[in-house]
């Protein structure tokens, strides 16, 4: 994964904790600009952003190619789901490309339901009810949050 621009780094690290949460996985690696020194590199990010209703959120997960299929996505998403539950959220959801079998398998393993997106059949809406004792929510419009 390349180095993040200052603007992108600020976006990942300056968070409004009332509306969003970002979990970042990093490793120390050799710094090519300073031989013999190490630099911290982001290898994965899981985040959620609350919808206007305050009860549900959209998630995103990004793992550097070299770190995929090593359990990092599972660790980050498990922590993100647990944090969303602790925050009192009812539903967390996201969109996944229909041909992204590893991501769909991960979401299924975590208990997410997988539906074909009504607006784009090439996408899958994956969602998890965080309080299983409550009735299932109606499908959410990802653009308006309602």
PLM features per residue range, with description:
Residues 1-146:
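Long, contiguous binding/interaction regions
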């Amino acid at each position: 994964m390349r180095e993040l621009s200052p603007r992108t780094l600020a976006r990942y690290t300056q968070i409004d904790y009332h509306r969003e949460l970002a979990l970042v996985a990093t490793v120390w690696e050799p710094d090519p600009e300073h031989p013999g020194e190490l630099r911290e590199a982001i290898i994965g990010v899981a985040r959620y952003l609350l919808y206007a209703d305050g009860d549900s959120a959209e998630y995103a997960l990004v793992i550097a190619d070299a770190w995929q299929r090593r359990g990092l996505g599972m660790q980050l998403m498990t922590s993100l789901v647990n944090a969303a539950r602790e925050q009192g959220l009812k539903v967390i959801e996201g969109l996944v490309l229909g041909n992204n079998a590893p991501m769909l398998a991960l979401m299924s393993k975590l208990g997410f339901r997988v539906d074909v997106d009504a607006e784009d059949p090439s996408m899958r809406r994956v969602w998890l009810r965080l309080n299983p004792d409550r009735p299932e929510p109606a499908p959410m419009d990802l653009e308006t949050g309602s």
